Amino acid sequence: MHKPVVTFGEIMLRLAPPGFERFLQSPQFLATFGGGEANVAVAVAGYGLPSRFLTVLPPNNPISDAFIGELRRFGVDPGLIVRGKGRFGIYFVENGANQRPSKVVYDREGSSIALAKSGDIDFAKAFDGVGWFHITGITPAISEDASTLALDSVRIAREMGLKISIDLNFRKNLWQWGKTAQQVMPALLKHAHVCIANEEDY
């Protein structure tokens, strides 16, 4: 039997006008969830492998509960999720059409994972019996505290013998807390067995 795969990162509420309508045209938004690491967890479960998603969500929050239900629907184990102070991050998407590019507006400041501190997540417990750990460069970009959590996660995963994959997923506009990706990511990458990148990440 395959050992579980754990992915770690932020999940956000995705709000988008239907079809190709623009923000200023539409009286409604379609609500779904979005996050690169959660997408990987769902994909892993789709291949029939045991999959777990780790994040920090606000407590006593119906949106958090709805997301956990969505994970279960796709066969992802949400049992590692930690509840902490803060809010649920949101992003708005306007789908592009023809020559008009898509537009994304983020509203994630003060999200639960951005406010989580080193020690709020017991990574040793989360990684017990796990075979593979996946993270992206989005998590350390969110905040200094999230960057510390990301480094804690890969360091402990490596110490416990897990295979580690890191998708750089460089988002220039996210790195606003004082350090750049070039300053932060090498410390994470030295623990990785697999690095996923493209020409825009360099």
Protein language model annotation of sequence segments:
Residues 10-12, 97, 109-111, 138-140, ...:
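Short glycine-rich anion-binding loops that position phosphate/pyrophosphate groups of nucleotides
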Residues 132, 138-202:
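Conserved beta-alpha-beta core of the PfkB/ribokinase-like small-molecule kinase fold
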Residues 1-76, 116-118:
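Glycine-rich phosphate/adenosyl-contacting loop at the front of the ribokinase-like
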Residues 38, 86, 199-200:
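Alpha-helix N-cap/helix-start capping motif
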Residues 7-8, 80, 106, 165-166, ...:
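General beta-strand structural signal in soluble alpha/beta enzymes
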Residues 50-137:
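Conserved N-terminal subdomain of the carbohydrate kinase-like
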Residues 20-23, 67-69, 120-121, 147-150, ...:
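Short, glycine/charged-enriched secondary-structure capping and boundary segments
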